[in-house]
Amino acid sequence: MKNILGGKGAGLAEMTAAGMPVPQGFTITTEACTQYYADGRQINDEITADIFEHVKGLEKITGKTFGDNENPLLVSVRSGARQSMPGMMDTILNLGLNDEAVEGLAKKTNNPRFAYDCYRRFVQMFADVVMMVPKSLFEVEIDKMKEAKGVKNDVDLTAEDLKELVGTFKKIYEDNEGKPFPQDPKDQLIEAVKAVFRSWDNPRANVYRKMNEIPYEWGTAVNVQDRKSVV
């Protein structure tokens, strides 16, 4: 099972089967990763359709909906190779947030500041990890905002401050990518899965594999799970 689901995915499957309280989700197999590379670093239509079918299942189980302004589904997207490779590959958190879902998160938690903090972090993480927009561009804007508001720490920024930062971050994204920040969570998900697959071949992962004699051909699985701790 570990060969197909990766170490993390196999562990999650075993815990779920044992009735342990594990956040709901699904695993995209190592075979999908090797197919991604075989197809010229593209996720083919069959795998895409399969991913979206599992998203529907996750929505049904959780009662949440991707992009919903009342009860949004937010997920984490994490790598999971057969053999543990700590810190070598990429993770994306709170995927599913957009201009509608952030309002749903604010209402559901009764905490707009928390919602917009999650959103600005997601935009920055997605831009950095998925699209390789330099993280420093966002950090500069955070520092500018804190200076303008006369505060020293991120936690001192208000919900309105963070909402303004979201707009600034989305503009940075569009200026660098030549297109708006994706509002469709399904588009976000496919791009995030590609990023995790790509990270199997990043320089630090390649060095780690060589040092630990992990075959390149294994590929990595991707674990998509409900962010139960958020909403």
Residue locations for each model-derived region?
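N-terminal beta-alpha lobe that positions the nucleotide/phosphoryl donor
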Residues: 1-223
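Conserved small/polar residues in nucleotide/adenosyl-binding loops
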Residues: 228-231
